[in-house]
C-alpha cells in the first residue's frame, strides 16, 4: 500500500501561510518604497515645477528628471484637457461649460481612476490617483494665474499650437472675478498641496499598518484552538 502522511494537510497549510506572509511582506515593502518616492517628489516639487514661484532653473540631474516628468505629465493632462473641450464641441454644450469642461476632465481623469481602485479595495492605488488629482489641480492653479494675460492664448503657449481662448480669462471675466485671479489661483494652489499631502499621509498609514500584534494574537489563538 502507498504510504500516506496523515499530517500532510498541516504541512500544506504551513506552506500556504508562509507564502501568504512572504507575499504580504513584499507588498508592504513595495508600498514603502513607493511612499518614499512620493514624499521625495512632494518635497522637491516646489523647487522644480516650472510654474511654481520658488522654481529655480539648473542643469542638475534632478532638474533634468523633473523636466522630463513634467513634459510627459503635461502632455497627458493636455490631451485629457482638450478631450474635455472636444466632448462639448460634439454635444454642443453652452460656451461656459465648454470652457470649463477641459479642467473638469483633467481633474476627473485621475479622480475616476482613484474611485475605481477604491471600489476594488486597493486603497494604496486609490491614494496614488488622489495625489495626481492634487498634481493636476496644481497645474490648474498655474493656468489660473495667467488669466490676466488676455482672452487670446497665443499659438506658442497653446497645447494645440494655434491661437485659442484662455479658459480662465473667459470664465473669470464672465463671473466678474478676473480682478481676483491671484487670490483664486493661490487658494487653488493651497488646496492642491493639501490634497497631495493628504494622499501621502494616507499612503504612510497604509504602508505602515499596525497589524503585527493582531497577527501574532491570531496565530496564538489558532494554535490554541488546534491543541484543544
Specify the residue positions occupied by each region the protein language model found:
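Generic low-polarity alpha-helical segments
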Residues: 1, 7, 31-35
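Short, Lys/Arg-rich, polar N-terminal cytosolic tail immediately upstream
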Residues: 3-24
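Intrinsically disordered Ser/Thr phosphorylation hotspots
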Residues: 5, 53-59
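Generic preference for well-ordered secondary structure
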Residues: 17, 60-67, 121, 155
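Short helical patches
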Residues: 17-19, 65, 69-73, 214-219
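Metalloprotease/metallohydrolase-associated module, dominated by Zn2+-dependent proteases
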Residues: 21-55, 94-228
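Short pre-active-site segment immediately N-terminal to the catalytic Zn-binding motif
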Residues: 58-78, 92-95
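Active-site recognition of the HExxH zinc-binding catalytic motif
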Residues: 74-90, 102
Amino acid at each position: 500500500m502507498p504510504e500516506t502522511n496523515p499530517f500532510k494537510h498541516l504541512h500544506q497549510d504551513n506552506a500556504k501561510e508562509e507564502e501568504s506572509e512572504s507575499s504580504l511582506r513584499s507588498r508592504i515593502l513595495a508600498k514603502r518604497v513607493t511612499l518614499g518616492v512620493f514624499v521625495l517628489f512632494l518635497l522637491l516639487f516646489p523647487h522644480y515645477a516650472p510654474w511654481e514661484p520658488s522654481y529655480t532653473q539648473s542643469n542638475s540631474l534632478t532638474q533634468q528628471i523633473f523636466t522630463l516628468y513634467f513634459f510627459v505629465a503635461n502632455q497627458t493632462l493636455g490631451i485629457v484637457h482638450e478631450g474635455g473641450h472636444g466632448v462639448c464641441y460634439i454635444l454642443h454644450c453652452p460656451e461656459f461649460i465648454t470652457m470649463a469642461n477641459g479642467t473638469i476632465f483633467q481633474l476627473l481623469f485621475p479622480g475616476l481612476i482613484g474611485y475605481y481602485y477604491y471600489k476594488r479595495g486597493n486603497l494604496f492605488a486609490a491614494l496614488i490617483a488622489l495625489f495626481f488629482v492634487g498634481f493636476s489641480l496644481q497645474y490648474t492653479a498655474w493656468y489660473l494665474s495667467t488669466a490676466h494675460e488676455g482672452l487670446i492664448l497665443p499659438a506658442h503657449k497653446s497645447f494645440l499650437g494655434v491661437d485659442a481662448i484662455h479658459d480662465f480669462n473667459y470664465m473669470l471675466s464672465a463671473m466678474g472675478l478676473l480682478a481676483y485671479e491671484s487670490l483664486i489661483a493661490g487658494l487653488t494652489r493651497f488646496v492642491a498641496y493639501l490634497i497631495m499631502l493628504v494622499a501621502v499621509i494616507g499612503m504612510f498609514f497604509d504602508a505602515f499598518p499596525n497589524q503585527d500584534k493582531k497577527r501574532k494574537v491570531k496565530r496564538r489563538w489558532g494554535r490554541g484552538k488546534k491543541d484543544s
